[in-house]
Structures are given as C-alpha cells and as structure tokens.
C-alpha cells in the first residue's frame, strides 16, 4: 500500500466471495505513529510484513527504543493501538447455484447491487467473485459457488450479477468491480494446481468458455481471475490461445 501511495496508484481492496463479501467480524483499530515521534516505554508499537503469498499479514511488536528509531529512520510505518475490539457484519447472500435457479436476471442483478452496496460501505473495491465454472462433476468441491452446468445460464447469471455490482440503479458506474473466475476449465478442486484439463476446441468454445464470453461481452467485468490448472498441457495464465 505504501508503495502504491508513493506512486499515486489507488489501492485495490479485495474481498473474497462467494455468497456476498467476506470480511473479518472483529478488528482492532491502529493509529499511525508520526515520523518524528519519541519512544514511549509504556506503549506497544507494531509493524508488519506480508508473507510470500501476500495473503497473511504478520504483526511484529517493537519492544525497544533502538529498533523503534531504526525503523522510523528507514521509513517503516509504525502503529499503536489500545486493543479495543470493534465489530462489523455483512449479509450472507444466496450462493451461485441458488441464484441461477431464480431464472430471473433482474433478481440476480439486484442481489449484485446489494453486494455492491456493502462493498462501498466497507471500502472494498474488488469482489473476488462470481465464480462461473461449469458443473462438470458433482464431486467438485466448489460447485455451490458456480451457477450451472449450462453455459448460457452461467453467462447470463454472471452478467446480471456483474451489472448489479458495477452499476448504480441509475446505470452509472459504481466505481467498484467484480472478478469473473476461474478462467478457465477449473472443474475440480482435487489437485487443481497441477491438473491438466484436456479439452477439444469445440467443447471449449461451446461449453467451458461460452459463459465467460457472455459475461464479458454483456457486462464488462473489471477483472478476470485465471485458474491454476493447465489446459492441454499449458498453464492457463500463460496460454496464448486462451488469453
């Protein structure tokens, strides 16, 4: 975040799905320590580093004045807190499969608009949903996230939910976006980071990619998330024919 700010790049605040946004129910507020602050032995100071994955933030307490001064001199951001717990809540929205069974894009769009309202409330700019892979195998561990085994239903449902999040009731851009995923052929969870989906061009175009095509052309999602698996021997995220 500090690097982005230094280059005047707006922060992207992510929230996972799939049934509405996913946020921490309780949190502690931290206050930024000024660059010219003096060390207070009765106060605990914190800094933090992201893990290699970028998903886990490790908090570190600064217990002595020497380290405190060094970190501030190095330009590190330090924080303090009184450890008061605050609480926040969001709505559990219907899962993708249930939304598709509504057979009503207008209803799905309103659900998306409700998700977008909560995103704006909590400062989320990118929703890591909706998932729209095809229901190929009933044993897929994330089928509940996805809409259907039918690419037309999947595409229209994704387009409707995308429009709901990304546009206001008056049709103007809301300033926040969705992430259609997982592009593409992510139809199993077991060994999904190393599996190889072997698929013909016809099956790819008519079944597995058609929903994404509809969602992109009808609703222009802000983001697309690639999948971990390979397709016909090549990783999806560096597959020239796919991208």
Language-model features: where?
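Glycoside hydrolase catalytic-domain context in secreted enzymes
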Residues: 1-243
């Amino acid at each position: 975040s500090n690097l982005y700010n230094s280059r005047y790049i707006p922060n992207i605040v992510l929230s996972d799905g799939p049934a509405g946004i996913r946020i921490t129910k309780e949190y502690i507020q931290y206050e930024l320590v000024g660059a010219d602050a003096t060390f207070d032995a009765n106060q605990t100071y914190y800094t933090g580093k992201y893990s290699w994955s970028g998903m886990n933030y490790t908090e570190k307490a600064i217990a002595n004045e020497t380290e405190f001064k060094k970190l501030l001199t190095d330009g590190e951001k330090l924080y303090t807190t009184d450890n008061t717990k605050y609480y926040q809540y969001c709505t559990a929205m219907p899962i993708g499969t249930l939304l598709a069974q509504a057979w009503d894009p207008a209803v799905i769009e309103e659900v998306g608009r409700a998700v977008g309202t909560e995103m704006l409330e909590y400062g989320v700019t990118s929703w890591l949903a909706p998932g729209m892979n095809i229901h190929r195998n009933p044993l897929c561990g994330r089928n509940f996230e996805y809409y259907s085994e039918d690419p037309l239903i999947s595409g229209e449902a994704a387009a409707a939910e995308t429009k709901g999040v990304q546009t206001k009731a008056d049709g103007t851009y809301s300033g926040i976006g969705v992430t259609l995923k997982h592009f593409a052929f992510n139809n199993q969870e077991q060994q999904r980071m190393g599996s190889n989906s072997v698929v013909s061009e016809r099956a790819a175009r008519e079944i597995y990619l058609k929903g994404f095509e509809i969602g992109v052309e009808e609703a222009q999602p802000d983001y697309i998330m690639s999948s971990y698996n390979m397709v016909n021997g090549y990783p999806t995220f560096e597959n020239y024919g796919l991208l």
